[in-house]
Amino acid sequence: MAVYKIVELGDRILKERAKEVPKINQNIIKLLDNMAETMYHARGVGLAAPQIGVSKRVIVVDVGEGLLEMINPVITSCAGHETDSEGCLSIPGIVGDVTRASVIEVKGLDRRGKPLEVKAKGYLARALQHEIDHLDGILFIEKAKNIRKLVPKED
């Protein structure tokens, strides 16, 4: 496995709609493995393939409930609204308040090509929406209010 450099704000791939994955092969499996390793190395809770320069509809998320991998994810339903602070590995040091659905259902494929349906609420729902936005070329700062620099805590 490998840790990839995370693409940052200003790279045009972050503004493009990622391409559907027509077939799951060894390259996609390797991509999933490398994305997870990159996400954990960066201490993130989610990563979309465009964030490592790959235009594929692939995401990985781990909000402390275990690794969730999704290929070609689609949000099929949303309910409620919550506003909370978000940041992004591609926009280091910046946070903002984003309103998102509080409960969602997402359909996609797992690494074996089997259908996967996830019902998520709270932080997992927020992380999934954030990563799926990346697949559509949308950055959190486009939806955020009260955008601010993250001030490091002093020890």
Curated annotation (Swiss-Prot):
Source superkingdom: Bacteria
Sample GO molecular function, one term: peptide deformylase activity
Enzyme Commission number: 3.5.1.88
SUPFAM superfamilies according to UniProt: Peptide deformylase
Positions annotated to bind Fe cation: C88, H130, H134
Protein family: Belongs to the polypeptide deformylase family.
HAMAP family in the cross-refs: Pep_deformylase
Name of the protein in its database record: Peptide deformylase
Organism the protein comes from: Pelotomaculum thermopropionicum (strain DSM 13744 / JCM 10971 / SI)
